[in-house]
Amino acid sequence: MSTRTALKTHNEIRLVFQRMACEIAEAFSDETDLYFVAINARGMAIALELNHELDRIQSNCNVSLGNIHVADDYRWEGVVPNMVALTTPVILIDDVIHSGGTAMQVLVDLYEHGFDTIRTAFLAEREHRNYPIRADFVGVSIATTLQEHVFFSNENPSDLQLYLI
């Protein structure tokens, strides 16, 4: 059985979301609209947390939420790209960036839609990427071995967990 090592407590993760939202608010202070594109369910959980924190900081910014399911069938939910103005800044959001393959796949799709500005946000960043993906907004950077995995658990919203397996 794999051992789990806690990387961040629930309260620390809440602070990470607050900091990331502040960074996004600062980077897009002149914008009134943003488009959050979340990858899979855990990406959507993070997008919702960031949106909540952004509302507390910068209430004049309207955030549209889209969710892309990549693992099984590559399907969109919520606000799809053709419903958003191409001048609206896009922030691609996921829980952990590992090799960068999933993010690369979605970034290519968003680029082909013609968006002017696309940035990325990840709760956790590992340093073992196979693709040239830059993490613009990062909660925590973690040096791992190739055999280790970083996992975000939001099964219990009052006990968020980030741990190393």
Predicted feature locations:
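Residues at the starts of beta-strands that form the adenosine-phosphate
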Residues: 33-35, 62-64, 89, 116-120
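Short, glycine/charge-rich flexible loops or terminal/linker lids adjacent to PRPP-binding catalytic cores
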Residues: 17, 48-89, 101-108, 130-134
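Active-site-facing substrate-recognition patch
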Residues: 1-31
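Short glycine-rich phosphate-binding loop at a beta-alpha junction
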Residues: 29-40
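Short active-site segment of divalent metal-dependent hydrolases/proteases
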Residues: 98
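Generic enzyme active-site microenvironment
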Residues: 92-93
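PRPP-dependent phosphoribosyltransferase catalytic core
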Residues: 108-165
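Cofactor-binding loop segments of dinucleotide-utilizing enzymes, especially the Rossmann-like FAD-
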Residues: 39, 68-70, 123-125
